[in-house]
Amino acid sequence: MPVSSHRYTQDLNKPALVLVHGLGSAGNIWKSLVPQLIESFTVYAIDLPGHGDAPLRDDEEMDPRSLAQSIVDYMVNDMGIKTMHVAGNSLGGWIALEMAAVAPDNVLSVTALAPAGLWYEQPPRKFPPSLDARILAKISQHFMKTAYRIPALKAIGYKKITHLWRELSFESCRDSVIAMARSKGYMPMWHGANGRRFESVVPERVKLSVVFGDEDLTLPEEIAQEKSVAPSHSRWIVVDNCAHVIMWNYPTLTVELIKKTALMAS
């Protein structure tokens, strides 16, 4: 399965940190965190199949567990990395948890930032909840500076994701619009997760943190933050005045959460 990554490092001897983006996103969603993260890690920002620079094949298995196995295989076989810390956001957070389940000897810790998959039941849906944002992205990619300045358009694209949508920088919006508009893997990856939930077993030796914002409108507490579905040894953290894409709202705090989880494994 073709995944790709962008590597950032000051020292290749620093422990590996794998970053996994969500549906319709790309590895560059993490770039505001990279300058701080490379002080402690060699960072590998993954592009999932059909997202960012990664190609999409017709025979892809796009469910979260298969994607998790593909990332581990890529890191071990292609990049030569035997042990790694992992962080993921949204569907990427679910995939990160699955990585710990499929490869507990390779994955030392997981920081799951607003992970999908933690619900009692997820009946199949006909359309993904972010479909309107994808349609808008396909249109607005051609006039992004203008769209960014029009509050109504910016609200359509981001109000479901964050109550702090007015504060998003042009760079963050530009990168996310391009990633969403051009993600050939958007629908295949959504179909791979649709109707499923996280049900895997993660050994206690893999350190886990599950982090949600208290203003998450995409995966709200009453629907999609079921502690009993997460591994029982997870450290559960709620961030005040924070929405679904935690690294947009609080990049420095996100870095600290990742570092603290990694330290638990040392």
Q: Predicted regions: what is each one?
A:
Residues K145-V202:
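Conserved alpha/beta-hydrolase catalytic His-Asp/Glu region
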Residues S66-M84:
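Conserved acidic catalytic loop of the alpha/beta-hydrolase fold
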Residues A101, V110-H142:
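Flexible "cap/lid" loop of the alpha/beta hydrolase fold
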Residues R182-V229:
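Conserved serine/cysteine hydrolase catalytic core
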Residues G88, G92, A96:
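Gly/Ala-rich beta-loop-alpha elbow adjacent to hydrolase catalytic centers
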Residues D47, H85, L108-T111:
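Residue in the alpha/beta-hydrolase core beta-strand immediately N-terminal to the catalytic nucleophile
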Residues R7-P55:
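Conserved HGGG/HGGXW glycine-rich cap/lid loop of the alpha/beta-hydrolase fold
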Residues C242-V255:
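Catalytic histidine-centered segment of alpha/beta-hydrolase-like enzymes
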